[in-house]
Amino acid sequence: MEKVVGTDRVKQGMAQMQKGGVIMDVINAEQAKIAEEAGAVAVMALERVPSDIRAAGGVARMADPTVTEEVLNAVSIPVMAKARIGHIVEAKVLEAMGVDYIDESEVLTPADEVYHLNKRDFTVPFVCGARDLGEAARRIGEGASMIRTKGEPGTGNIVEAVRHMRKMQAQIKQVAHMSTDELMTEAKQLGAPYELLLHIKETGQLPVVNFAAGGIATPADAALMMHLGADGVFVGSGIFKSDNPEKFARAIVEATTHYTDYERIAELSKNLGSAMKGIDVATLAPAERMQDRGW
């Protein structure tokens, strides 16, 4: 029997449906329902949010399938789940469970330091993190249907997400202004498919949606990332590590939608309680920097 896999066009189209929205990390059915009621376009099912993964240390793996199954049964919006970088079997298990997207994630401890997954071996679409155009292009070349900035997960500090989004947008503009004979050299330097760079030159954008993630903790943070060109945002620890998750969730969704309405964002930001406690990224040791995982 011939293996059936989803085409790039179909999988990228599925990801396009999340454009302009907020995707929230959840660890149980109750949180998933809060996210759905707040207006999240999808949820990411985990055993622990990134800040807890960071605090616990050790090896972080795919969540217990019971957690993922609980979330799948609790909501009608799409459910994502994380697999370790390069871990073919974790990804196949998640696909068999019926998740809507798989995140090949640097938040988990990489299983393979040489190879990322060949996403075209799967029917389910993949989302992958990137710090710059080179990383984004390589993941898209492997079949990723959605890109997100890596940021620095679990810190509540947006500085790295801003750095990654600004760098990616600047590099896209550079490629758009290159002559066609410069593209091959650029493709070689980035380790990216020439045809992908040609698409970027002709359209001025990636062929997939590009979300912001890593350190988004407030409505203003979400609006900032949209202002910088993100197609939507992932919020990991920022919601359920806040004082008032329901209120934070609704406020971040609304700020993402109305990111240029600054009076509205001011109102949304009132009386939310404390945001999650943040970490100064500059204090992290090299081994603690999740964004450096993958290539």
Curated annotation (Swiss-Prot):
InterPro entries: Aldolase_TIM (IPR013785), PdxS/SNZ (IPR001852), PdxS/SNZ_N (IPR033755), RibuloseP-bd_barrel (IPR011060). It comes from the Bacteria. GO terms for biological process: amino acid metabolic process; pyridoxal phosphate biosynthetic process; pyridoxine biosynthetic process. The keyword Secreted does not apply. It is an enzyme of class 4 (lyase). It catalyses: aldehydo-D-ribose 5-phosphate + D-glyceraldehyde 3-phosphate + L-glutamine = pyridoxal 5'-phosphate + L-glutamate + phosphate + 3 H2O + H(+). The keyword rRNA-binding does not apply. Pfam families: SOR_SNZ (PF01680). Pathway: Cofactor biosynthesis; pyridoxal 5'-phosphate biosynthesis. Keywords: Lyase, Pyridoxal phosphate, Schiff base. D-ribose 5-phosphate binds at D25, G154, G215, G236, S237. One of its GO terms (molecular function) is pyridoxal 5'-phosphate synthase (glutamine hydrolysing) activity. The active site is at K82 (schiff-base intermediate with d-ribose 5-phosphate). SUPFAM superfamilies: Ribulose-phoshate binding barrel (SSF51366). Transmembrane segments: none annotated. D-glyceraldehyde 3-phosphate binds at R166. Its EC number is 4.3.3.6. Catalyzes the formation of pyridoxal 5'-phosphate from ribose 5-phosphate (RBP), glyceraldehyde 3-phosphate (G3P) and ammonia. The ammonia is provided by the PdxT subunit. Can also use ribulose 5-phosphate and dihydroxyacetone phosphate as substrates, resulting from enzyme-catalyzed isomerization of RBP and G3P, respectively. Belongs to the PdxS/SNZ family. In the presence of PdxT, forms a dodecamer of heterodimers. PANTHER family: PYRIDOXAL 5'-PHOSPHATE SYNTHASE SUBUNIT SNZ1-RELATED (PTHR31829:SF0). This is Pyridoxal 5'-phosphate synthase subunit PdxS. The gene is pdxS.
